A protein has these predicted regions:
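Terminal low-complexity/charged segments
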Residues: 1-167
């Protein structure tokens, strides 16, 4: 399916199709991300190169948050980005871990740093911050210098000391 025809195939799911740096971007209503991504995978976009989130707090856009899926079709070497928009009140999308196993840790990272939940994920727990960490540090409304929580992080001692050079 050419990406130019995807809006015709999913008229209720696709907000628009744009292009940046000669690569297409498909803007999707969040609740339809799994349907659209499943179709794209069956049409040859078989590799999830990256999955990340965007906080549009100061940028505007369809919703405050978007999850960007960067896909690659190995057969044609074509790249494609799908941006699934997440309403701030819901902060939830269907997980794509069933389509691409490498989405496992990437979805956990987005959950940990932005607070976006991925429904159906097999193990959605924090991956970088302590499990009792309060907040989501990559959100634009998170204090730039933190909330003094770093003073409570455990200190990890190095198992060795640097040796002094003798000449």
């Amino acid at each position: 399916m050419p990406h130019s025809k995807i809006k015709e195939r999913f008229p209720d799911a696709i907000l628009e199709v744009t292009e940046f740096a000669a690569e297409p971007i498909i803007h999707v209503k969040g609740q339809h991300n799994l349907t659209v991504l499943t179709a794209l995978k069956s049409d040859g976009y078989n590799f999830l190169a990256d999955l990340t989130a965007i906080d549009n707090l100061t940028l505007g856009g369809y919703e405050r948050f978007a999850v960007a899926y960067h896909l690659l079709c190995h057969a044609s070497a074509q790249r494609l980005t799908v941006k699934a928009y997440v309403p701030e009140k819901e902060l939830s999308l269907p997980s794509v871990e069933s389509l691409w196993k490498n989405a496992d840790w990437q979805e956990r990272e987005v959950f940990d740093l932005y607070g976006i939940r991925f429904e159906g994920h097999p193990n959605l727990i924090r991956i970088m911050n302590p499990h009792d960490f309060d907040g989501y540090p990559l959100r634009k409304d998170y204090p730039r210098l933190g909330r003094k929580e770093r003073s409570d992080f455990p200190v990890i001692k190095r198992p060795f000391k640097k040796e002094k050079r003798t000449e």
